[in-house]
Amino acid sequence: VFLGAHETKRFGPLCVETFASTDAGVAFLISACGETIFHAGDLNDWVWEGEPPEENQAMTARFQAEVGRLSGRRIDAAFLVLDPRQEADFAQGFDYFMRHTDTVRAYPMHFWNDFSVFAKLRALPCSAPYRGRVALETEYCAQR
């Protein structure tokens, strides 16, 4: 089954809704049995140092628009990008998502086996409101 952005498909008790990516593919919101999981795929605020400011601003606007589509929905588990390659901006998308959605538990992904991003995220003052809702690196079984 192929789903493009902004489509909804039911598979028995499973409901799959897609969101546009800011890179490749789509993001998924999957609901079943009263639980909801969000998998961001490559949906992230992909801002890069050295890129033209207008490109980074357009990226941020696209990302925020997609996250806005989740407004008012409870997300039990969200798998979100936390990419160390973005250097100082590594948590920008993650932070925005957590501050603008009703997410119970967030699981960083796309961190290229660089588990140091977990501690870096926890050290950011902006993460204080949701810090306790982010999975710890010890919850990942394929560590180092």
Language-model region placement:
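Conserved protein kinase catalytic core
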Residues: W48, E87, S116
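Residues that form or flank phosphate/diphosphate-binding pockets in enzymes
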Residues: G25, A88-D89
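Core dinuclear metal-dependent hydrolase active-site scaffold
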Residues: F2-R74, E139-R144
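Structural beta-sheet core signal
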Residues: F38-H39, L80, P108
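Binuclear metal-ion centers of metallo-dependent hydrolases, dominated by the metallo-beta-lactamase
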Residues: F2-T8, R69, F90-R144
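Catalytic metal-binding/acid-base residues of hydrolase active sites
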Residues: T22, N44, V81-R85, H110-W112
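Conserved acidic residues
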Residues: D76-F79, V104
